[in-house]
Amino acid sequence: MKKFLAIVLLVSLALTVCSCAKVYKTETVKIDKGSALMIAHRGLSGMEVENTESAFIAAGERSYYGIEADVRRTADGDFVIVHDDNLRRISGKNILVEESTMEELLAAELIGKDGQPERLTTLLNYINICKQYDKQAILELKSEFTREEIGLIVGLITAMGYIDRVTFISFDYDNLTYVREILPTQSAMYLFKKLDKNITEKLIRDKIDVAISYKALTEEALKEFKAAGLKVNCWTVDDVKVAERLAAMGVDFITTNILE
């Protein structure tokens, strides 16, 4: 019976690992992007493990305008680069990000590429890579940060001499409000999935740029945003025809996992 249970557990573990496995491409897919600038989503995540130094370096070595990454708070008041609030999807382990210390998070082994382990990285390391490769840092504020925490993030990047090359993005409008209270002219984009008159009016009023799901953007809305002086970023586009159509429409940025 014990032997049978052990076999069941091993099979379950193998199935879990297989279900989490991701197929990575060996090179980017080139497109006719016109004047649109390309942003590598969570680094070059179509080729490397998302939000890792490997993904950021891979993007840095190519023609991308910007490298996007997600930042969350840790239990000990630090800032880690990771998308999900739980590491289960990327590590196979139930680890809550904001209830873990930076040391614990950096020790977690991620599901790697070609059987090679990967690990998370810090906000400072991400900014350093953007700086090394002269890329715009597109930093998504994932947590619902306090104004004090936003101040700490801004202070850390300012001390590194790279704040002028950072665009803050977030689904949480308060995060961007705090950024603008501290740095009134800082580049900022609001992330949203559907067109909404109230959102449009708010963005135009606050002069916060647009980061919209490509599925929601219409030519009429694009014209309205551009007429108001707002820049438009579409996410997350991995289809060549869709990307080239958006570029022809005149979007400013295309966020992608693999297109270049």
Show where each model-derived region lies:
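Residues within alpha-helical transmembrane segments of multi-pass membrane proteins, especially transporters
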Residues: 14-18
